[in-house]
């Protein structure tokens, strides 16, 4: 199996154009510029003791009413400074849904082994190889831009030393990266099974938009990537139970997407 994965890695790597990597870097360079020159809050839900959403401005000041709602202005600033560099995670699902098809050379049905008896093992190897390539490129750019933004905030914000907490930043970056990784793998599975047409990509994008708007009015975390990102990037304390829940939900998401795609593919091959 390891040899097959390696073979697929070389095959998919030859398929990916160098312009794709340049495009990813250009997109995230724009993300850095956008975050430094944008609104202080994106898609936020303010509630008692926790503000969900994306907060690109590390110098955001609370109003008197918001201070009473959150409970402690100093705790808010401490959390805000260390999660602000992750705000551009809002766009990650949309970027991934559009870029992942570039890492998929062809759909499973189009492959010469698409309907063979050995398709199961080869499909798993193909998904693993494609997920590795796309995750390395997308997550690498995401993590790099987050670190760059954190360093810029440390240099620009006057009271950065007071709120600097590298452990908190790395912890939130890790959680956010896990959610992004799960979404990338799910996107690879969907595109591998159903292609990169308007239907599959449109469905991926629609789920993200719907999840954000539902989470704005929901009291608890939804087991959807965009919803989980609003928590990991939000100015809200996360307990160990919530972090474990995020990891479990990520695994369930990937497994659910794989199960749905596999079932639909079997039905399609049987009746078509």
Model regions and ranges:
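Junction motif at the cytosolic side of a transmembrane helix
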Residues: 8-11, 252-272
């Amino acid at each position: 199996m390891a040899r097959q994965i390696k073979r697929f890695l070389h095959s998919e790597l030859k398929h990916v154009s160098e312009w794709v990597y340049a495009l990813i870097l250009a997109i995230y360079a724009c993300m850095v510029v956008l975050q430094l020159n944008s609104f202080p809050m994106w898609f936020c839900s303010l509630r008692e003791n926790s503000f969900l959403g994306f907060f690109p401005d590390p110098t955001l000041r609370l109003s008197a009413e918001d201070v009473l709602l959150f409970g402690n202005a100093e705790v808010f600033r401490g959390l805000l400074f260390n999660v602000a560099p992750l705000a551009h995670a809002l766009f990650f699902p949309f970027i991934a849904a559009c870029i992942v098809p570039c890492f998929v050379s062809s759909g499973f049905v189009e492959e010469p082994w698409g309907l063979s008896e050995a398709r199961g093992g080869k499909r798993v190897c193909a998904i693993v190889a494609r997920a590795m390539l796309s995750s390395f490129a997308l997550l690498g750019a995401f993590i790099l831009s987050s670190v760059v933004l954190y360093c810029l905030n440390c240099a620009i914000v006057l009271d950065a030393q007071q709120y600097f907490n590298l452990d908190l930043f790395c912890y939130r970056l890790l959680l956010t990266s896990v959610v992004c990784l799960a979404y990338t793998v799910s996107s690879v599975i969907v595109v591998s099974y159903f292609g990169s047409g308007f239907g599959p990509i449109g469905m991926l994008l629609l789920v993200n938009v719907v999840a954000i708007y539902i989470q704005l009015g929901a009291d608890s975390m939804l087991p959807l990537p965009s919803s989980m990102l609003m928590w990991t990037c939000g100015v809200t304390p996360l307990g160990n139970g919530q972090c474990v829940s995020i990891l479990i939900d990520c695994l369930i998401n990937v497994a659910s997407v794989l199960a749905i795609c596999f079932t639909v593919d079997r039905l399609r091959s049987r009746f078509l």
